[in-house]
From Swiss-Prot:
Region span, Straightjacket domain: 19-63
Record protein name field: Transforming growth factor beta-1 proprotein
Presence of the UniProt keyword Ion transport in the record: no
Signal peptide: 1-18
Motif stretch (Cell attachment site): 241-243
CDD domains named in the record: TGF_beta_TGFB1
Keyword Transferase (UniProt): no
Function description: Transforming growth factor beta-1 proprotein: Precursor of the Latency-associated peptide (LAP) and Transforming growth factor beta-1 (TGF-beta-1) chains, which constitute the regulatory and active subunit of TGF-beta-1, respectively. Transforming growth factor beta-1: Multifunctional protein that regulates the growth and differentiation of various cell types and is involved in various processes, such as normal development, immune function, microglia function and responses to neurodegeneration. Activation into mature form follows different steps: following cleavage of the proprotein in the Golgi apparatus, Latency-associated peptide (LAP) and Transforming growth factor beta-1 (TGF-beta-1) chains remain non-covalently linked rendering TGF-beta-1 inactive during storage in extracellular matrix.
Pfam families assigned to the protein according to its UniProt record, in alphabetical order: TGF_beta (PF00019), TGFb_propeptide (PF00688)
GO terms, molecular function: cytokine activity; growth factor activity; transforming growth factor beta receptor binding
InterPro entries noted in UniProt: Cystine-knot_cytokine (IPR029034), TGF-b_C (IPR001839), TGF-b_propeptide (IPR001111), TGF-beta (IPR016319), TGF-beta-rel (IPR015615), TGFb1 (IPR003939), TGFb_CS (IPR017948)
Entry similarity comment: Belongs to the TGF-beta family.
């Protein structure tokens, strides 16, 4: 057996060790470490080298406007947390394959309906090809529609238009996806739109064609049918004749969908990972949950008791939480490099070749504090651990 590949992998794992801070800690040690980290975070975020000196006289009652500002900030943060999309699952860890699926470029037969118009252009894709390239819906991680805005002529440089992207349905209806202002410049520019949800629908449905429409924004007061002509030129829609058409097809950069998907051979790992819930507070703090692996661990920090601080008026403390637990479901017993990892750990017992349990979602913390007799309201970023991941 040639030892070269094995040695190369061991060297790579040695480099990875230098980037890892993952260490085994008992629960009490982890709590103490988190409390000290919070102490340093708060002081550094407020640009303080030490806690403000305590006032000799008790602080006056909070002004109504300060209390109102603090309460409204808390409500806004709660609303944002409710609307926040769920964190990425464990499959975020794995490398993704990139698949390039160009749009259809013939305008005859059933495609004749999708010829470019003065104010709109259409991107038509063979959904059967998308399914063959990507595989199942569960394997798709992200999809982007990419197109090249061609450089503008000297007399139209600086032109700016509001363009809107829509997804087409079989019943001739359209769903708005994205809008953006695009400026024509003297250089080519790649434009990209997130179409992950649309491609997910293609992979789940039975449609033969998937269609996107890019249109010039039509102000409401003008009414439908009165949109400006599209002055932004997208490569791939030029109409050539005769021999020039075949030559142009070879060299033009047509719009395409870039699909990022897990390889099909990793479907078993994906299926196993998706059986796990998101490692957030809803799951980790749920009734009956006794998760031994990576999860959010509860930790309430009392500013007076744990930090010996009296200068923070509100809140009196907060749920800081922390991440803790092994990550066995990524480096499992059936992983192909298990033997190599075991050999590496044998020679490097203090190393951690496996991923670490680290924060994935963090929320801010609003506080009211005094500097002398002056009251201030501040929002401290990334203070509350809401979800963890293995990385």
């Amino acid at each position: 057996m040639d030892p070269s590949p094995l040695l190369a992998l061991l060297l790579l794992l040695g480099a990875a060790r230098a980037l890892s801070t993952c260490q085994r800690l008992d629960l009490e040690a982890a709590k103490k470490k988190r409390i000290e980290a919070v102490r340093g975070q708060i002081l550094s975020k407020l640009r303080l080298t030490a806690p403000p000196p305590a006032s000799e006289t008790p602080p006056r009652p909070l002004p109504d406007d300060v209390r109102a500002l603090y309460n409204s900030t808390q409500e806004l943060l709660k609303q944002r947390a409710r609307l926040r999309p769920p964190p990425d699952g464990p499959d975020e860890y794995w490398a993704k394959e990139l698949r390039r699926i160009p749009m259809e470029t013939t305008w005859d037969g059933p495609m004749e309906h999708w010829q470019p118009q003065s104010h709109s252009i259409f991107f038509v894709f063979n959904v059967s090809r998308v399914r063959a390239e990507v595989g199942g819906r569960a394997l798709l991680h992200r999809a982007e529609l990419r197109m090249l805005r061609q450089k503008a002529a000297a007399d139209s440089a600086g032109t700016e238009q509001r363009l809107e992207l829509y997804q087409g349905y079989g019943n001739a209806s359209w769903r708005y996806l994205h809008g953006r202002s695009v400026r024509a410049t003297a250089d080519d520019e790649w434009l990209s739109f997130d179409v992950t949800d649309a491609v997910h629908q293609w992979l789940s449905g039975s449609e033969l064609l998937g269609v996107f429409k890019l249109s010039v924004h039509c102000p409401c007061e003008m009414g439908p049918g009165h949109a400006d002509e599209m002055r932004i030129s997208i490569e791939g829609f030029e109409q050539q004749r005769g021999d020039m058409q075949s030559i142009a097809k070879k060299h033009r950069r047509v719009p395409y969908v870039l699909a990022m998907a897990l390889p099909a051979e990793r479907a078993n790992e994906l299926h196993s990972a998706r059986r796990r819930r998101d490692l957030d507070t809803d799951y980790c703090f749920g009734p009956g949950t006794d998760e031994k692996n990576c999860c959010v661990r509860p930790l309430y920090i009392d500013f007076r008791k744990d930090l010996q601080w009296k200068w923070i008026h509100e809140p009196k403390g907060y749920m800081a939480n922390f991440c803790m637990g092994p990550c066995p479901y990524i480096w499992s017993a059936d992983t192909q490099y298990t033997k190599v990892l075991a050999l590496y750990n044998q020679h490097n017992p203090g190393a951690s070749a496996a991923p670490c349990c680290v924060p994935q979602t963090l929320d801010p913390l609003p506080i009211i504090y005094y500097v002398g007799r002056n009251v201030r309201v501040e929002q401290l970023s990334n203070m509350v651990v809401r979800a963890c991941k293995c990385s």
